[in-house]
């Protein structure tokens, strides 16, 4: 089992590394050239900027039983199809039961943008979100260890 982080814009890279270290689980950080994130205790793979270049690199590496951290619903869906456990930076675990509704919500938001309406942005990150993320990741790791 490996934890793969879609690190472009990911606020929980360091928290993930801290938890992974406690469980002895290797971490791979994947990012593009505008977000190079070298961290001790993790392998960092850097890819050219481009539409979904990091996403496709991550999908090509993920294996059944791996854990993926991403906020990208499309990437999450592809990783679920490869039997990975997938969670976002707020501790929401993506599953076969919720991914379709999340993808539909993303589609509806993009439709609104095309009409000139802008959905409300995300509020500032809170400590509670970090706690939820840590709890979810630890539960997954405890289950798989």
Residue ranges of model-derived segments:
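Nuclease catalytic cores that cleave nucleic-acid phosphodiester bonds
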Residues: 2-145
């Amino acid at each position: 089992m490996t934890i793969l982080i879609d690190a472009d814009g990911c606020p929980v890279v360091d928290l993930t590394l801290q938890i992974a270290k406690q469980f002895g689980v290797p971490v791979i950080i994947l990012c593009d050239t505008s977000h190079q994130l070298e961290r001790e205790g993790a392998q960092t793979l850097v890819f050219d900027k481009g539409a979904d270049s990091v996403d496709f690199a991550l999908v090509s590496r993920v294996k059944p039983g791996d854990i993926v951290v991403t906020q990208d619903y499309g990437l999450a869906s592809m990783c679920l199809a490869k039997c990975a456990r997938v969670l976002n930076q707020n501790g929401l675990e993506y599953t076969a039961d919720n991914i379709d509704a999340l993808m539909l919500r993303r589609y509806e938001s993009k439709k609104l943008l095309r009409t000139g309406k802008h959905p409300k942005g995300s509020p500032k990150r809170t400590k509670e979100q970090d706690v939820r993320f840590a709890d979810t990741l630890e539960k997954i790791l405890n289950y798989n260890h």
